[in-house]
Structure formats: C-alpha cells, structure tokens
Amino acid sequence: MAKRYEELTIEDDFMFGKVMEDRELCREVLECLLEGPVGKLEDVQTQREFRYTSDGKPIRLDVYTRDRKRIYDAEMQRLNHQSPEKLELPRRSRFYQSSMDMDHLSKGKSYRELPEGRVLFICTFDPFGLGYAKYSFQNLCTEDKKLYLDDGTEKIFYNCTCDAEDVPDDLRELYEYIRTGKVGGDLTRRIDLAVERARRNEAWRSEYMKELLHDEDVREEGRAEGRAEGIKGTIRICKDFGLSFEETINRIREMFQLSENEVREDMKLYW
C-alpha cells in the first residue's frame, strides 16, 4: 500500500530525490558516501529518464548529477517485499553506468572524453549478505588482482543495516537516520530539515499524488481481474489528498472508463 505524502521519509525514492535537489546538500551526501571530496555540482536531475529507441525499455535514475570530473547516479533502494537476488542490483548497476555513458556520447563527445562514473546504491538491507558496511566494485584482471582496468567506473552498494565501529561517524549517522529517522550530526540534521520542508511543499504533494495515480493506472492496464483493487486503491489516494466525493468519482470514471452509476456503486463500498 502506498504511503501518504506526509509519511514519506528519506528512504522513499520520491522524498530522496526532492531532498537531493538541493545541490549543496546533495554534494555533502555524496562526499559522505564516497568518503572524499566532490566538486561543485553542475546540475542535479531527479527521476531522470533515459530512452534510446522509441520502443526501447526506459530507465529512471533517482539522482543523476555531475561535477567537473565525474558523473554520479545515486539510488535509494528498498527490498519492497522482494529478495536481494530478485532486484538484480549488479546488472542494474551495469545498465545504469552504460546509460550515463550513452547520455554523454549522445552529445557528440568522444569516448576519450568520458568522465569517471560512480553508481551508488544506498540499500536499506545488506545487498550481499556479508555484513560489510559497503561493497565497492571496480574492474580488475582475473589473472593479476593488482592490475586494474582503470576504466574510470566504480559501483558501490551501501548497507544501511551496518553499525560497525570502523564505519566513519558521519556515514554511520547517515545509515542510522535512513533506518530510524534519528538525527545525529550536522548532515543528518540538514537532511531532516529538508524532509520537513518537502512535506510542506504542496506542489510536490500534488506531483506525488499524480505519480501514484499514474502507477495505479499502469497496474490497471495489466490486470482486468484486479479492477476492484485498483479502484479501491485510487479512492484511498484521492481521499488522502483531499479530493471531494464528486471529484473522486470523476477521477475514477476517467481512469477506468466506467459509467457514473458503476462508480457510485464502488464508492458505496470503498469511500
């Protein structure tokens, strides 16, 4: 069941994206994750969609940004009632990196000009089950582990369940904030303030509602049997966002192509 807007936290990708639209805060979060300096960010794009052919599968990156040296993709990842294996994070990280490279090359630049790339998955679970605070991957030679390909890419998976003592303080505080909402140092305090501001942003509330309604519509297209559940979910979303009884009827008629009488019968059950 989808959360109400005021229930969203930093671990929800919609809220994560809105908080990271603040360039300076985004830069500081990246520095915390990478444990090193990040340059001034040129742009921060959230829910950036890539589609390279008209019939190709599109992808959306939670947070896509760059400085003078690198391009970054930061993803907030929950299990969503799936196993880590079903999420296929390793292959997704490969796909995301290639998409960022193609975006760069599509602007007429040579592969020699490809910037370094960092794909970061901030996981609310242990993605590989070994207990490490993070898992960092670079390409290296199978025959000689000291020989790196040096292609400029790195994929890092963060385990927010880890609270080991050897984790840097600011990263441990970030993990704890993502897990529990507890504010620690200055960075998590600023993130928490940004979350509170976002919850009061009516334009973002409306945007979130539209996304939920769109998702309900997409699910409805693929499940005739589940029409009742789709209508029920849509009614709940409309109520949560303050739509009136009649406004909700009009919304459902439009989405599900039903008569007014049919919708009113459903409203008797679920309103």
Regions found by a protein language model. Give the residues of each.
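Accessory alpha/beta interaction modules
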Residues: 1-154, 164-166
